[in-house]
Each structure stands twice: as structure tokens, then as C-alpha cells.
């Protein structure tokens, strides 16, 4: 009886060198589910671009990719967002242009009702893309690829930006699709995000793909490797405390933020209403809730980046919004890191320039910085572990490195109020822990007041003094604020 010929791989990378990443050999066969782990800045984003066929300069080697391969990545989401901005007809319509309906990104949407319901997207399919939250737009990108009937699907950081329920449901759905024959490759920065049902695992570290093979043999090696991971983020509270910022010391008797009966909407779509929130100096506030409930919109109201900030009964740093104050009187006391800020950084500029721009509250650097300002920005890049990438264009950094640069931008001026909207998205577990440890020390020493949005249970640290929870059932109980005793 003749021996069976070995199964040909669907995908093979061998002897590759591209953008600082070396791949000796990895082969993916039909029906396998790969989990590939990589630290922030390790080259995981380069691997994503290779798998998506988006990297033009591959120096050598073999790159066998199937034609029916789909990719969901931060870079593709950014490209789609920028395309939507270019097509914005608001000025011609004399009304806000919501953008392409989400439904149009899904092939034969009516035949994917079960998946749409599972991802909880029924209510957003007819909404314009520009009116989607970051989590909703990520779900649409996943649905878009799943609706194509592909043989291979690559997901970069598949669970980042999704609420807890959506993470669990996506994990279950991907497992089911794998059992039905879909070949999966999941690129993750946190070992906790690697599904238990992965058949194969690999590690990207120090510019090379290592330790690839069956999950049972590789998982112990990943755990051992994770124990040795060093965070890039090395900022210390002492560094921030000893540097003079641009902001004035806080008056503990005056609320930083005071919102009464707050509301928000996009077009005709109501996001939330009836929200009361007061943040005094030291009232470090955690905000949680499902995708699309209005968490990021609340941050935009406070920062002045949502037009309805002038229609609300909202006071920020003692300024009643709409009373004649300038937005710069608000911005000068704020440090911001958010998905909205991240995707709107479309201008050219180096990592150093982006950090410096935090001193001027601008997207892009349009001032010649003083020597001491430049020195301070260089110090922040050193504390972020990115000194060697100071001159690199912001968009040529990995997504996680971009996030670290934006953290430096938000912290450089020692703000009175730090608005952090999912700041650890794209970061590995070591950098996530380092940032949270830093914030805990900053809170303890009263260097600033922190408002923090997160979907992750492991980010709910004890330094938060109040917890604003947005409910998935807004009609029954839209918000809950604890432990202050206030509720809505």
C-alpha cells in the first residue's frame, strides 16, 4: 500500500527577511489554528503585513500565500478610516455626512444574520461608518472578512477594543469556524489572548519568528519566554514629579469636571442621556461598558472634541462650556490618549515630534521647540524605550509603539487631568503592567487625576476612587456610579 503524500501547506514562509524581521521557516496547513505571540515592537506588525501581502520589500526567500486569505489589522482599519474621511461630503450636503453604511462592508449581509447577531451589530448596520465606535468598527472589519467565504483568516490583536462579552462570543465563533474548516492565524501581544483551542503556536521576538510548532510543545516555551519579557515603558513617577509642566496646580475645592443631565448623539442616533458626573482632584475614575455605549463620546465632550460639549451643562476646569472660553484653555490642562486621537494622527512627523506636540496640544508639530523642550521629549522617548526610533515617522512604528509615543505626548506636560481611553490597546502584558504601575504611583502622589476607560478586568486597579458603568440595557439603567453613592 503506497504511503500517503504529505499534505501541501496552504501558506509557507521560508528564508524571509523584511523590515527587520527574519523568518527561517513556518508552514500552515489547512484546518490548523495558529496563535502567534509577539512583544510590543518585536516585529509582529511586519508579520501581519507579510501575511496580508502588503509588504513590497521582502529581501529574500519564499512567500507562499493563498489568494483566499483575509486580514483584519489596525493598519487596514486606519486605511479604511482615512478613505472614509476623503469621501466626507459634509460641506456639500450642508449636514453631517455619516459615511458609508456599515452594511455595505459586508457581503450578502442578509445571509449572515446569525454572525451579525452574535457580534451584536444588528443596530449599527445602517449607521454610517464615521458614527461607529472604535469597537464597533473593529467588529465590522471582522464581519467583513468572515463574510467573504475565505479559507484562511489572519486576525491581528483580535480581542483588542472589544468588550468582555464580545471577546467571549468572538472566541466561541472563531472556534466554531475553525471546527468547520477555516484556517486561522491569530497575532497577539498577550499570552492570555491566545485561545486554548489553538493547534499550533509560535513566538516573534527580537526580530525573528521562533519556537513554532504544535501547541502542546510550544506553550511551555511561550510561558517561559513571557516571564523574561522586559517592558519598553520605563517612566518613573520621580521623572514626572521633578519636571515642571505647563499646567497650574489644582485647586482641590473646585471640580475638574462637572456634568449635569449630560447627553450625546450622532445625527439622529442617541448615544446616552441623563448622565451626571462630578470629578474632583484625586477622583480617579474608571469607566466601563459595552462597545458603542458612549464611553469615548464622554471623553470627547470633556476634551472639547465633540460639538455637543457646548450644548451640555458642562463645566471643565471652572469654565462653563459655551461661555466664551477657548478650547485651548481646556486643552492646556489635559493629557489625552484615545483611539480617536490615534487614528486622527494622519500628519507626517517623527516619534520625537509627536511627543513634542503634546506641549502645544496640536496634532503634528508646527512650532520650533526650545532646547529644553526637545531635551524633555528625548527623555520621555528614553523612558518609553524608544530612543533608537526618535527620528522614525510615527506611522512606520508598530501600533503598540505608536501607542507608547502617544502616552509620552499625553504625559510630557504633567496635565491636571489625564484622559486615557483604552491606552493599552496594542501593548503587550509587560508594558500594560508597567503603565498601570506608573499610574498607580502617580495617583498615590496626587500628580494628576486620571479618567480611564477599559474593557479589561486586569486593569481595574484599586487606585480608582469611582467607577462609572455604562449598562448594555440603557433603557432600564443607563449608568451606575460607585462607590460615591451616586446613581442614575
Model-derived regions: residue spans:
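Conserved structural motif at the start of ABC-family nucleotide-binding domains
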Residues: 11, 19-23, 257, 271-274
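ABC ATPase nucleotide-binding domain signature region
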Residues: 38, 44-110, 300-363
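Conserved ABC ATPase "signature" region
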Residues: 110-125, 356, 371-389
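Conserved ABC ATPase signature
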Residues: 128-133, 368-369, 393-397, 401
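Hydrophobic anchor residue at the start of the ABC signature
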Residues: 141-142, 407
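Catalytic Walker B motif of ABC-type/P-loop ATPase nucleotide-binding domains
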Residues: 153-157, 418-422
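Conserved beta-strand-loop-alpha-helix hinge in the C-terminal portion
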Residues: 208-236, 461-462, 470-488
Amino acid at each position: 500500500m503506497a504511503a500517503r503524500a504529505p499534505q501541501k501547506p496552504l501558506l509557507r514562509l521560508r528564508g524571509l527577511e523584511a523590515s527587520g524581521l527574519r523568518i527561517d521557516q513556518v508552514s500552515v496547513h489547512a484546518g490548523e489554528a495558529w496563535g502567534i505571540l509577539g512583544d510590543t515592537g518585536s516585529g509582529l506588525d511586519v508579520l501581519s503585513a507579510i501575511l496580508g501581502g502588503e509588504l513590497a520589500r521582502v529581501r529574500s526567500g519564499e512567500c507562499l500565500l493563498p489568494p483566499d486569505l483575509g486580514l483584519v489589522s489596525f493598519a487596514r482599519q486606519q486605511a479604511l478610516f482615512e478613505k472614509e474621511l476623503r469621501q466626507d461630503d459634509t460641506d456639500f450636503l450642508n449636514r453631517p455626512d455619516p459615511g458609508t453604511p456599515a452594511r455595505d462592508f459586508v457581503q450578502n449581509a442578509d445571509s449572515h444574520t446569525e454572525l451579525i447577531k452574535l457580534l451584536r451589530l444588528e443596530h449599527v448596520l445602517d449607521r454610517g461608518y464615521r458614527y461607529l465606535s472604535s469597537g464597533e468598527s473593529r467588529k465590522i472589519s471582522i464581519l467583513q472578512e468572515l463574510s467573504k467565504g475565505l479559507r484562511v483568516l489572519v486576525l491581528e490583536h483580535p480581542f483588542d477594543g472589544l468588550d468582555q462579552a464580545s471577546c467571549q462570543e468572538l472566541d466561541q465563533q472563531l472556534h466554531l469556524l475553525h471546527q468547520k474548516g477555516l484556517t486561522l492565524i491569530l497575532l497577539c501581544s498577550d499570552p492570555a489572548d491566545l485561545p486554548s483551542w489553538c493547534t499550533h503556536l509560535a513566538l516573534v521576538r527580537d526580530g525573528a519568528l521562533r519556537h513554532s510548532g504544535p501547541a502542546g510543545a510550544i506553550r511551555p516555551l511561550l510561558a517561559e519566554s513571557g516571564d523574561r519579557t522586559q517592558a519598553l515603558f520605563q517612566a518613573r513617577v520621580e521623572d514626572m514629579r521633578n519636571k515642571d509642566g505647563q499646567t497650574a496646580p489644582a485647586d482641590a475645592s473646585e471640580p475638574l469636571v462637572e456634568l449635569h443631565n449630560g447627553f450625546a448623539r450622532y445625527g439622529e442616533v442617541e448615544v446616552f442621556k441623563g448622565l451626571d458626573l462630578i470629578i474632583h482632584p484625586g477622583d480617579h475614575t474608571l469607566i466601563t461598558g459595552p462597545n458603542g455605549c458612549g464611553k469615548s463620546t464622554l471623553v470627547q465632550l470633556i476634551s472639547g472634541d465633540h460639538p455637543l460639549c457646548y450644548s451640555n451643562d458642562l463645566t471643565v476646569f471652572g469654565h462653563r462650556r459655551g461661555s466664551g472660553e477657548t478650547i485651548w484653555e481646556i486643552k492646556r490642562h489635559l493629557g489625552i490618549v484615545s483611539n480617536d486621537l490615534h487614528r486622527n494622527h494622519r500628519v507626517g512627523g517623527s516619534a520625537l515630534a509627536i511627543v513634542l506636540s503634546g506641549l502645544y496640544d496640536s496634532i503634528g508639530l508646527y512650532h520650533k521647540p526650545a532646547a529644553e523642550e526637545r531635551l524633555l521629549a528625548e527623555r520621555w522617548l528614553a523612558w518609553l524605550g524608544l530612543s533608537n526610533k526618535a527620528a522614525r515617522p510615527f506611522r512606520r512604528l508598530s501600533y503598540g509603539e505608536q501607542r507608547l509615543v502617544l502616552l509620552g505626548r499625553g504625559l510630557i506636560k504633567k496635565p491636571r487631568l489625564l484622559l486615557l481611553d483604552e491606552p493599552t490597546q496594542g501593548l503587550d502584558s509587560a508594558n500594560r503592567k508597567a503603565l498601570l504601575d506608573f499610574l498607580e504611583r502617580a495617583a498615590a502622589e496626587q500628580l494628576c487625576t486620571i479618567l480611564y476607560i477599559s474593557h479589561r478586568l486586569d486593569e481595574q486597579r484599586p487606585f480608582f476612587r469611582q467607577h462609572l458603568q455604562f449598562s448594555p440595557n440603557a433603557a432600564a439603567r443607563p449608568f451606575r456610579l460607585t462607590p460615591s453613592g451616586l446613581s442614575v
